């Protein structure tokens, strides 16, 4: 009779326990890049929203490789990144127990989409958040106190972070409540960081001031949820033989009689997906500009390249499936990223010093695919589709009726 072999390596990693639903929807930055005072003052992270995927064609610049100077097709993810608004500054002091908050200063004017984050039910609330606080900026005593806070932050703080929020009204999403996060300011002295942050209070910060072309970044987010799953799907254990009594997709032995407990390391059924994950080393292929009005005309050609001069936007025909149209600035990342469409993602500067040739390679895009992602798309633009299909019957009837 056939039987399975008696020894086998364990299935599934224990490094990600507990496999339960994430307590937060927005990816948390657990460590920021190391500060270098010799560099200019800059932010180290940004928030974006996953729109969807497409593919590009590029020429490889890797001397000595078989694919050098040849065209390759690469899958890419589009993350929409409208400008973030700075609404606060936080100063931290280093203590033997780690960083401790020293002072927090908020801006005078804070938008409703940011205030919504401080309420469970905005509709039923009195909407009074920050009404007393903003008066600090208006009377003389309050201004003196704020100046005192800023001077003490310059004197005692070692780390400066800004509080920034996303602009939900610019996105094709139903959610009105903005996502809020602390972003560490690196580079320069503490005084320079604080002055930089004060200048940008209530100002918009675009993504191209944080990241650059061809940069390697980390993506932090919550994965796509799969619900309650069995042990075979969740841990990828081997299915039992066909004639097994009471089921095949199970673990036959969950441990010895004593100790009279099931060990934590034994694969069991439970929650799969919606886990907090950090993926490192995602290369930026392109930082695209959103739609803009120039000389009274709407400019959309943010998917054109030096080789493909057709006037087209990054949006595929019909928009990104389950997302809509990307009208703001966007970041094009190599490969896939965690989460479902519309999921908020935290983009962070890399913690590592990049030395590999692949990381430092210059990306030269030849073509960006904009065919429909719903079915087998074959047309890059609506003009191309109309030219191929010819006039529609309804258009012809309307023309005849008009005549």
Curated annotation (Swiss-Prot):
Residues 18-31 have a biased composition (Basic residues). The gene is RPL3. There is a cross-link at residue 294 (Glycyl lysine isopeptide (Lys-Gly) (interchain with G-Cter in SUMO1)). One of its GO terms (molecular function) is RNA binding. The keyword Ribosomal protein applies. It holds the Pfam family Ribosomal_L3. It is found in: Nucleus, Nucleolus; Cytoplasm. Belongs to the universal ribosomal protein uL3 family. It comes from Macaca fascicularis (Crab-eating macaque). The modification Tele-methylhistidine is found at residue 245. Constitutively monomethylated at His-245 by METTL18. Methylation at His-245 regulates translation elongation by slowing ribosome traversal on tyrosine codons: slower elongation provides enough time for proper folding of synthesized proteins and prevents cellular aggregation of tyrosine-rich proteins It is not required for incorporation of RPL3 into ribosomes. Component of the large ribosomal subunit. Interacts with DHX33. Component of the large ribosomal subunit. The ribosome is a large ribonucleoprotein complex responsible for the synthesis of proteins in the cell. One of its GO terms (cellular component) is cytosolic large ribosomal subunit. The modification Phosphoserine is found at residues 13, 304. Residues 1-37 are annotated as: Disordered. This is Large ribosomal subunit protein uL3. The keyword Iron does not apply.
């Amino acid at each position: 009779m056939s039987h399975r072999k008696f020894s086998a390596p364990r299935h599934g990693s224990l490094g990600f326990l507990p496999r339960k639903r994430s307590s937060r929807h927005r990816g948390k930055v657990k460590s920021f890049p190391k500060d270098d005072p010799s560099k200019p003052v800059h932010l180290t992270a940004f928030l974006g929203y996953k729109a969807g995927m497409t593919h590009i064609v590029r020429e490889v610049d890797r001397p000595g490789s078989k694919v050098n100077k040849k065209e390759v097709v690469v899958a890419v993810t589009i993350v929409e990144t409208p400008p973030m608004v700075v609404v606060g500054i936080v100063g931290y002091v280093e203590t033997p127990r780690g960083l401790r908050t020293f002072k927090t200063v908020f801006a005078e004017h804070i938008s409703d989409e940011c205030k919504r984050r401080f309420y469970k039910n905005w509709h039923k609330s009195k909407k009074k958040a920050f009404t007393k606080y903003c008066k600090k900026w208006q009377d003389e005593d309050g201004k003196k106190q704020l100046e005192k806070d800023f001077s003490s932050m310059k004197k005692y703080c070692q780390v400066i972070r800004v509080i920034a929020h996303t602009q939900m009204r610019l996105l094709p999403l139903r959610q009105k409540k903005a996502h809020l996060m602390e972003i560490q300011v690196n580079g320069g002295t503490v005084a320079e960081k604080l002055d930089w942050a004060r200048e940008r209070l209530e100002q918009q910060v675009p993504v191209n001031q944080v990241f650059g072309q061809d940069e390697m970044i980390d993506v932090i987010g919550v994965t796509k949820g799969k619900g309650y799953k069995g042990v075979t799907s969740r841990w990828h254990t081997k299915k039992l033989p066909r004639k097994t009594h009471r089921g095949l997709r199970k673990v036959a032995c969950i441990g010895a009689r004593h100790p009279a407990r099931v060990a934590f390391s034994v694969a069991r059924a439970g929650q799969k997906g919606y886990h907090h994950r950090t993926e490192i080393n995602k290369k930026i292929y392109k930082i695209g500009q959103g739609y803009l009005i120039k000389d009274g005309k709407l400019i959309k050609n943010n998917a054109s390249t030096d080789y493909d001069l057709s006037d087209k936007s990054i949006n595929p025909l019909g928009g990104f499936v389950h997302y809509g149209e990307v009208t703001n600035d966007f970041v094009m990342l190599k490969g896939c990223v965690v989460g479902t469409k519309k999921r908020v993602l935290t983009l962070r500067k890399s913690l590592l010093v990049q030395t590999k040739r692949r990381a430092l390679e210059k990306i030269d895009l030849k073509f960006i695919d904009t065919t429909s992602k719903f079915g087998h798309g074959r047309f890059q633009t609506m003009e191309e589709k109309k030219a191929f299909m010819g006039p529609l019957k309804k258009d012809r009837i309307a023309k005849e009726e008009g005549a």
